[in-house]
C-alpha cells in the first residue's frame, strides 16, 4: 500500500486547539457547537469558517490555523478565530476555555455530533469512546520528505514527557481530583490505536503497517490512528498530539515553538548525515506515565541503566540548547515562555491552587480557565 507524502517546508507550522463551550451560569459544558458554527459560516463565509470545526461532542469546537511560517503567525491566526467564536458564544451565554478535561462535567450527558465518523467510533468503541470528553492541542511541523518522517517521529518520542509535563491540565475528572497531573492522557491511551507510536523504521514500514490495519478491519483510514506523535501524509507534517489542552494562547505558543525547534533541528541533523536515535519504548512509556502522574515534578529516566533526572531540569537545558534554532526561526520569545510555565506552574498546578483557595469549589477552577482564555496568559494568584 503506497501512501503519498506531501513535501512541506521544514519550518511550516499548523496548530489545532480544542475548546470547551461552557455555560457562564452553571459553569458546565453546553452542547451548542452546531449553532455557533452555523452562525460563524453566515458571518465570515465557508472559507474562513473552515478554521473552526466540530469534534466528537457538541460541547467542543476545534480551532485550526492555516499553514503558517512562524509561531507568531500561528498564534495570531488562532487568536482571530477565537475572537470570532467568543463573540458568537457570549450571545448565547457561553464562554470558551481549554483544559485537558472539564473539572466537573459528566461525559454521559454530552450530545454526540451528528456525523457518520463519530457514530461509527462510538458504535465500535462503546464506553471507551463515550468517555472521550477530553481536550488537546495538536502541533503540526513540516517535514520535507517521507524518508524523514518516521525517523523524526521515533526521535521525538524521547520528548513525550517534556510536552506532557508542560501541558498537563487535567487533574480533575467528574468533579474529583484524580491525583494525576494529566488524566486526559490516560483516558485517551485506552483506545487501541492511541498512545505511543510503534517505532517503525522507515516510510515503507509505515505503509505496510497501515495496510495491515486496514486489511484486518482495525481501521478504515489512517486518520483513525491517534498516536501521541504521528506522520500526517496529506499535510506533509509530523503531528504532536500528546499535549493536554492548554488554557492560554501564551502556553500554546510555547509548546508550538518547542515542537517547531525540535523538528527543524532534526531535519537539519538528517541532512548532515546524522542518524537520529530511537529511544527504547519501555523507557518512553514509563516516562510518559511519570509525567502524567507528577507533571513538572516528574523524575524521568534518562538512560538504560535507570538514571533519573528532574524533567524541569531537562526542559531548562533543552530550551537553552534550542535557542539558536529559535532565533533563526523567529520564535525565541515563545520558546522562552516554556521557562515561564516552569516558574508559574503548569495548568494542573494552577487549577489545584484555585480550588484550594476556594475551599474545593471547582467553579472557581472553571472561572480561572475562562479568564486565562480571555487574557491569553496564565492566571497566578498569590
Swiss-Prot record:
GO molecular function: ATP binding; glutamate-cysteine ligase activity
InterPro entries to which the protein is assigned, alphabetical: GCL_type2/YbdK_subfam, GCS2, Gln_synth/guanido_kin_cat_dom, YbdK
Catalytic activity line of the entry: L-cysteine + L-glutamate + ATP = gamma-L-glutamyl-L-cysteine + ADP + phosphate + H(+)
Pfam families in the cross-refs: GCS2 (PF04107)
EC number(s) given by UniProt: 6.3.2.2
Gene3D superfamilies reported in the protein's UniProt record: 3.30.590.20
Signal peptide feature range: none
Keywords (A to Z) from UniProt: ATP-binding, Ligase, Nucleotide-binding
Protein task: ATP-dependent carboxylate-amine ligase which exhibits weak glutamate--cysteine ligase activity.
Name the UniProt record assigns to this protein: Putative glutamate--cysteine ligase 2-1
Organism, as annotated: Frankia casuarinae (strain DSM 45818 / CECT 9043 / HFP020203 / CcI3)
Amino acid at each position: 500500500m503506497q501512501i503519498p507524502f506531501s513535501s512541506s517546508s521544514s519550518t511550516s507550522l499548523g496548530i489545532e486547539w480544542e475548546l470547551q463551550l461552557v455555560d457562564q451560569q452553571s459553569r458546565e459544558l453546553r452542547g451548542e457547537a452546531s449553532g455557533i458554527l452555523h452562525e460563524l459560516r453566515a458571518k465570515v463565509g465557508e472559507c474562513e469558517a473552515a478554521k473552526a470545526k466540530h469534534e466528537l461532542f457538541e460541547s467542543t469546537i476545534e480551532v485550526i490555523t492555516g499553514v503558517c511560517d512562524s509561531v507568531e503567525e500561528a498564534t495570531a491566526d488562532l487568536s482571530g478565530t477565537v475572537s470570532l467564536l467568543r463573540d458568537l458564544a457570549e450571545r448565547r451565554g457561553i464562554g470558551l476555555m481549554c483544559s485537558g478535561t472539564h473539572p466537573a462535567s459528566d461525559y454521559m450527558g454530552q450530545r454526540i455530533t451528528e456525523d457518520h465518523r463519530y457514530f461509527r467510533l462510538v458504535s465500535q468503541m462503546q464506553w471507551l469512546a463515550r468517555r472521550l470528553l477530553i481536550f488537546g492541542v495538536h502541533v503540526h511541523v513540516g517535514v520535507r520528505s517521507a524518508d524523514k518522517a518516521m525517523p523524526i517521529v521515533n526521535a521525538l518520542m524521547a520528548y513525550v514527557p517534556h510536552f506532557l509535563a508542560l501541558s498537563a491540565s487535567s487533574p480533575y475528572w467528574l468533579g474529583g481530583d484524580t491525583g494525576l497531573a494529566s488524566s486526559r492522557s490516560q483516558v485517551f491511551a485506552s483506545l487501541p490505536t492511541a498512545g505511543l507510536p510503534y517505532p517503525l523504521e522507515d516510510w515503507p514500514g509505515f505503509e505496510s503497517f497501515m495496510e495491515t490495519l486496514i486489511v484486518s478491519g482495525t481501521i478504515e483510514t489512517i486518520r483513525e490512528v491517534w498516536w501521541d506523535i504521528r506522520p500526517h501524509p496529506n499535510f506533509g507534517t509530523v503531528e504532536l498530539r500528546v499535549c493536554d489542552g492548554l488554557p492560554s494562547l501564551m502556553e500554546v505558543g510555547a509548546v508550538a515553538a518547542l515542537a517547531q525547534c525540535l523538528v527543524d533541528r532534526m531535519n537539519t541533523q538528517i541532512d548532515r548525515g546524522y542518524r537520529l536515535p530511537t529511544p527504547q519504548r519501555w523507557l518512553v512509556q514509563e516516562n510518559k506515565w511519570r509525567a502524567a502522574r507528577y507533571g513538572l515534578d516528574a523524575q524521568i529516566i534518562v538512560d538504560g541503566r535507570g538514571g533519573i533526572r528532574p524533567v524541569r531540569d531537562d526542559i531548562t537545558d533543552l530550551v537553552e540548547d534550542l535557542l539558536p534554532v529559535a532565533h533563526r526561526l523567529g520564535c525565541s520569545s515563545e520558546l522562552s515562555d516554556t521557562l515561564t510555565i516552569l516558574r508559574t506552574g503548569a495548568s494542573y498546578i494552577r487549577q489545584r491552587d484555585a480550588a484550594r483557595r476556594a475551599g474545593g469549589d471547582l467553579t472557581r477552577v472553571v472561572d480561572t480557565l475562562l479568564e486565562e482564555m480571555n487574557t491569553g496568559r496564565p492566571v497566578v494568584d498569590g
